[in-house]
Amino acid sequence: HFRDKVRHSPDAIFHNADLYPPQYVRARSVTWMRTDDAVTEPRRLHQGGAGYALERYFVWAITETPLGKWRREYLIDPLLYWRRKVHWRNFEASYDAAELEPASRTRSTYVLQEYFVPVEKFDEFVPKLAEILQRFRVNALNVSVRHAQADPGAVMAWARGDTFAFVLYYKQRTRDNAKNRVAVWTRELIDAAVSVGGCYYLPYQPHATPEQFHAAYPRAKELFAIKRRLDPAFRFRNVLWDKYYAPNLS
């Protein structure tokens, strides 16, 4: 579908597919196309600053009620997409992230992860992803699939060819044992991505082992060499540098 209908279409502006948990066998593909038709939504931008009570209720219900995920897949989303919509491009790009913010993060929180796999490995990666998330009973709200073109120049490029990005948005408890459990299945997902020639997004929680880090980013040693040359005293640092670079200094 993506190759035939979206990838080379000059009118495709935004594209996204959502894999529905907990089975991950069905997806809803949405493509916004360039058109000269009259807009169905006159606003050019979302205003922001609203209470978002309804949006937050649905996020809670999807993750906490017995039929929440089923309702989203078979009732809520079909209603949201049953009418053809014509929006300004900036309107679709200006949603307020606050509508996803929970009322409290004391006992639970929502977290993002992202994995990148070659486009041609989609069918190989998805069953691996599904098996891991199901086995660990990950309370996934959404797995969004997006496309990225190759980035041949960057040393730490995550899109080394035509790439699908799998953006996992999930809910987890804040207890220490819950955090430790997340680290375990995250490392399994990293292995799954690497096994098909992919990698994972670095800026999120540094659960990857040093071996996984270098398997996912085989040119990291080139970056480390630049770091040693430009910052020999290791003054500029963060968690990533401390975990994957600092051990090589001794």
Regions found by a protein language model. Give the residues of each.
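Noncatalytic alpha-helical scaffold of FAD-dependent oxidoreductases
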Residues: H1-S250
